[in-house]
Amino acid sequence: MIRIEDIISLAKRKGFVFQSSEVYGGLSGVWDYGPLGIELKQNIQKEWWKNMVYSHENVVGLDSSILMRSEVWTASGHVESFAELLVDCKNCKNRFKIDSIDFSKGCPNCNSMGTFTDPRSFDLMFKTNIGAVEDSSNEIYLRPETAQGIFVNFRNVLDSTRLKVPFGIAQVGKAFRNEIVAKNFIFRTCEFEQMEMQFFVHPNQMDDWYYYWQQKRLNFFIEILGIKSDNLRFKEHKGDELAHYAKAAIDIEYKFPFGFQEIEGIHNRGNYDLSQHAKFCGKPKLFEYHDLISGDRYIPYVIETSLGLTRSVLMTLCDAYAHEELEGGDKRIVLRLHPKIAPYKVAILPLVKKDGLPELARKVFMQFSDDFYMFYDDNGTIGKRYRRQDEIGTPYCVTVDYDSIENKTVTLRHRDTMTQVRIPINDLYSYVRTEILNYKGVSDR
């Protein structure tokens, strides 16, 4: 059984994730991504973008700003609805969401009865001011979601691209929520990244597209990221669980060490957002779609797919992590990341630091450097170097030895099976590229 403590230890030790401001004691709910973490995160983002935008001729990208006028959040309902009712336990000083407590059983932490404060509202949005003077007239918010930047640009994208319904707008960006309890490492944080797509459809086509995107998104995790299918499930929201903007919602949940939790939400937002902005900005025609063939004018319905990028990093680490017992009593920690998202694709390892092997190894390294992020390691025994690469998820290790000088071949070792094959140096690049493209994924091994 994988423990979240194992993942946290690996993440810091190997440079995936660090505590923010650690030298000053750290900042709760905020994390920095190290050399390997940023590569893993960017690789996941790249695969998502290819799958959502490049694979669909009717989906385009957008990068909206973090800061927007406060009217955007008034219209969206966040100013009124994006808050939690909280109570504090007077005995242990812990704070809880009011809907998470059974008052008849007392405090979930210390079991004290009748020690709660009166409920009070807790705003989940971060406020700031824009301009030289702090005043309510220039108060703005750090965005709590990326979706609204898409909705307020609906007309700009429609006019500039000449897209026709159905079409989608995708973006990746940071969002901020003043989380009451930031917990489970990078799963729930105050600063996070979302990968969202808003898909605009005719109301009569909502059900078909809603189902389409559910299946499309589930397949992304299994086929592209290589997540084990047994660790994924759908969970549909009940009526009282729906957000204020949603007509229907279904989550894709992943089985983390702390249980099944949402990794992506697929929502039927109806025409709530576009209608709200049409109403509040006083320009309703900006949010209408005119079908030139049928002559219909209507406000499109919206299907949202919202995936947490930072949560995806945690998911891939948990899913790939394994502690193996090998023959002879040896052990290894291995990250079986899909090669497409692994930080390093190949490690080049000269057997020794002499006799021309480092020079040849550098030449082999240069074969890949334009297309793949590579690692060069000449320190320690070859066995220890293999173990170091296993632990950070490098799928292929290439050893340059004395035979490499004589017959121009190298040894390629597969991370997952530890099997080795001898390959001509001139064929190495095409071999690795084919291996990455044809990799079956963790769930099929």
From Swiss-Prot:
Indicate where this protein resides in the cell.
Cytoplasm
Which residues are involved in binding ATP?
A: 177-179, 187-192, 262-263, 308-311
EC no. given is 6.1.1.14
Q: Which UniProt keywords apply?
A: Aminoacyl-tRNA synthetase, ATP-binding, Cytoplasm, Ligase, Nucleotide-binding, Protein biosynthesis
**CDD domains (alphabetical):** GlyRS-like_core, GlyRS_anticodon
Gene3D superfamilies, per the entry: Anticodon-binding domain, Bira Bifunctional Protein, Domain 2
Family listed: Belongs to the class-II aminoacyl-tRNA synthetase family.
The protein in question is named Glycine--tRNA ligase
Species of origin: Borrelia hermsii (strain HS1 / DAH)
Q: Which gene encodes it?
A: glyQS
